[in-house]
UniProtKB/Swiss-Prot annotation:
It comes from the Bacteria. Signal peptide: none annotated. InterPro entries: AAA+_ATPase, ATP-synt_VA_C, ATP_synth_F1_bsu, ATPase_a/bsu_AS, ATPase_alpha/beta_chains, ATPase_F1/V1/A1_a/bsu_N, ATPase_F1/V1/A1_a/bsu_N_sf, ATPase_F1/V1/A1_a/bsu_nucl-bd. Its EC number is 7.1.2.2. This is ATP synthase subunit beta. It is a peripheral membrane protein. One of its GO terms (molecular function) is ATP binding.
Amino acid sequence: MAQVQGKIVQCIGAVVDVEFPRDQMPKVYDALKLEGSPLTLEVQQQLGDGVVRTIALGSSDGLKRGLMVTNTGNPITVPVGKATLGRIMDVLGNPIDERGPVDQSLTASIHRKAPAYDELSPSQELLETGIKVIDLVCPFAKGGKVGLFGGAGVGKTVNMMELINNIAKAHSGLSVFAGVGERTREGNDFYHEMADSGVVNLENLGESKVAMVYGQMNEPPGNRLRVALTGLTIAESFRDEGRDVLFFVDNIYRYTLAGTEVSALLGRMPSAVGYQPTLAEEMGRLQERITSTKVGSITSIQAVYVPADDLTDPSPATTFAHLDSTVVLSRDIAALGIYPAVDPLDSTSRQLDPQVVGEEHYQVARQVQGTLQRYKELRDIIAILGMDELAPEDKLVVARARKIQRFLSQPFHVAEVFTGSPGKYVPLSETIRGFKMIVAGECDHLPEQAFYMVGTIDEAFEKAKKVA
């Protein structure tokens, strides 16, 4: 069948209206190709009289009325499977790493339905991260969804990189990294770090363990809106082969923001705080596809920017509903110099249940949170009256809470170049043992600075000898 042609009748920024013969209008989400140009347009609305409204997936510089456009008759398709490993691609699956074309023999549409209810497979298995605060108070589930929430500059990307370092390297499966509207520099750093660690095998790309899809800050909103779907499509194809996949998204907020820009360009009425009226539906459509089936699993870790540190903002609030574990990064904790700046009282996990993690882990985590909560309540009294006015048992709580707070810090492998101290991976059993000793009072004689930036509790004892 001959491909149908239309012509551009209006261009307003990234929004392009194209006129087709009335009886041959493209369907919503069909990809249109501009003649003599690599630019792709995606149909968003049918306006009637043969005119469709599209979003340009690329720069619309130089577009003018009258240019011819061809309807491909299908949604955007991208290469999937082994050919994507070790490669960096854009939203359309074109390589941007200057290492030759990507094999297109296996492709998939970026718009797909979520798996049916009877295909889903819930998981109770824990995923050890080697980061004490996460393993203790908000453990991750294999095949679960995790959100890293935080404002600007509290360490979302560094935490994400450490998780990739600890899980992706130890994890024998494959990873997909979607850079959605983030800094190009970070994407470049990530690629080189993966190459240095051997996760990307530059000699033999097929032996690599990660596929990367980037739609950076400087790209048009259409690219940033669809790049998460491109990454997800690659992850789904690996899952459907029966593999366990790690899917990293940095940053899911930029996906929402791109949706807001596209919505405004299409002339939709904004809803609360200027977000698109379809915010919940767009987020749901993406998140429902990130799931584990009886064939394979997708474990997803998503960084979520929190505008103005307000967790009630519609964008992070909508994301919360879809997650199994939430890791909340706090500016107050970062200000104390405690990294990772995870708030152990705000962070939650569905896995923190005695039937999943075991009675000992559950009790230790709750005792740690209880001690920190009591310290939080006493801080106002300490600020006004000082430590001397506290009851002896409260003084003990404060001393233990400060030790716990410092023991929750940990040197990261990916931050070695900044801190100069080697990174530490702490097994879950050691994490539980360490915190159990602190809450039981076995470390009451140690100075609190001995607990700062160490791995296991044994290192704290060693450090205490040097401090003394």
